[in-house]
Design a protein with these regions (language model features):
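Short, acidic/polar
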Residues: 3-11, 133-145, 258-282, 306, ...
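Aromatic- and acidic-residue-enriched segments that line the glycan-binding/catalytic groove
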Residues: 30-43, 84-119, 159-198, 252-263
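Active-site-adjacent "subsite" loops/lids of carbohydrate-active enzymes
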Residues: 77-149, 197-208
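Active-site neighborhood of glycoside hydrolase catalytic domains
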Residues: 148-149, 153-157, 162-163, 167, ...
Length: 388
């Protein structure tokens, strides 16, 4: 019943597409596959309480949304959290907690105390090592199962490294040394990044910029494989990603979502001349840009304004991806409570036109926030103004 109501509200507001998250950060799934467990519980807002809800139903969650979307004339896409395998929630949930044989899949962090498995850190989301060949094979196989559904598109979220401290495993070291022509790094990891460093130092260690280049290549190569996996099952499905618009610091997660013709090194000193070679925009049929600015920063030309995030992304992608849509996170955009409720409502209205005017479309993250605050009317008003 709820899916019918939710999609009807989205359709009435003027949305043309919905994206259904079918692999949360635990790494378990809400679609049919034999590769990993089904989601057994979720936390949801019930009234004013964030409550654990056990999943006892056995019906196909994704198929139910596909069926309802088709009835209502909406396009439907599935999204997965990609390089994740567990979450600390409920004492630890997900593949990395259940299956000790996959311990090497967990990303290795460059901590002050030494290189440490993410499983032994306070990071709540337990990431895989994106460079691990078995991880990549597992995820491509998972995507093949997902592509079997009647979907218009698939989006990869968290298709990245956890942060700048990842991944410093022996596997990544071996691959990097091979990438560098077979060198042996004598002072590892210090010649790349000092233990415990979580941001770029004033003086770059010997191999840091080549390491950033290598990480971008790891993600670029994976995206090519993932696209091939999806298109091999269903060539007509649109393949895409969901990324943050803050390109100026997105090196920290190893992602270059720009066009390969955008020469990053002309603008940022952390980028090598080869960094641009691993811009993966041309691999994508559609890209969602998280334009996650404050509700008080709708308009502008710089990062950390919604309009600026979208216009800068469109410029960097240079037409290599045909659909670039940006939009706000309306549930987490004012953590310091600087905006009034009316300012937030009007930011939703204004954000649609601000984003759509400078890129190819608009998305809103996410439906639960509109439902909780009963803000559908503001999305509807904004869409109407944007398409007039």
């Amino acid at each position: 019943m709820y899916k019918r109501q939710d999609l009807a509200l989205a359709k009435d507001a003027g949305f043309t597409d919905i994206v259904v998250d079918v692999r949360p950060t635990t790494g378990d799934v809400l679609f049919k596959t034999n590769l990993v467990d089904q989601v057994k519980f979720m936390y949801a807002w019930i009234g004013s309480n964030y409550t654990k809800v056990e999943r006892t139903a056995t019906w196909d969650y994704l198929q139910a949304f596909v069926d309802e979307a088709r009835k209502q004339g909406l396009r439907i896409h599935a999204a997965i959290n990609t390089f994740v395998g567990g979450n600390q929630i409920d004492g630890g949930t997900g593949l990395l907690y259940r299956d000790q044989s996959k311990a090497e899949w967990a990303t290795q962090m460059n901590m002050q105390v030494g290189i440490t498995s993410v499983m032994n850190t306070s990071e709540s989301t337990k990431f895989f090592n994106p460079a691990h060949p078995e991880v990549q094979t597992f995820l491509c196989d998972l995507l093949k199962d997902l592509a079997g559904y009647d979907l218009d598109g698939i989006f990869l979220d968290r298709g990245r490294f956890l942060n700048l401290q990842a991944d410093f495993s022996e596997e990544s070291r071996k691959q990097f040394e091979e990438y560098m022509g077979g060198i042996r790094i004598q002072n590892y990891p210090n010649d790349i990044l000092a233990p415990g460093a979580s941001s770029l130092p004033a003086t770059y260690p010997k191999y840091l910029t080549k390491w950033l280049e290598f990480r971008a290549k790891v993600i670029y190569d994976f995206m090519q494989k993932a696209r091939t996996a999806v298109k091999g099952v269903k060539p007509g499905i649109k393949f895409g990603v969901y990324v943050g618009g803050w390109y100026s610091t997105y090196y920290d997660v190893g992602v270059n979502w720009a066009a390969s013709t955008y020469d990053t090194s002309r603008y940022y000193n952390w980028a090598t001349s080869k960094y641009k070679n691993y811009g993966y925009a041309a691999c994508m049929d559609q890209i969602l840009i998280g334009a996650y600015a404050s509700p008080l920063k709708v308009h502008g030309t710089t990062e950390w304004t919604m309009e600026g995030f979208c216009s800068l992304a469109k410029d960097k992608i240079k037409g290599e991806c045909p659909i670039v849509a940006g939009g706000p996170d309306v549930g987490n955009w004012d953590t310091n409570n600087q905006a009034t409720q009316e300012q937030e409502n009007q930011a939703i209205v204004q954000s649609v036109k601000a984003c759509m005017n400078v890129c190819d479309g608009y998305f809103l993250f996410d439906m639960i926030h509109l439902k909780k605050a009963d803000q559908w009317q503001y999305a509807k008003e904004g869409i109407k103004l944007a398409i007039e």
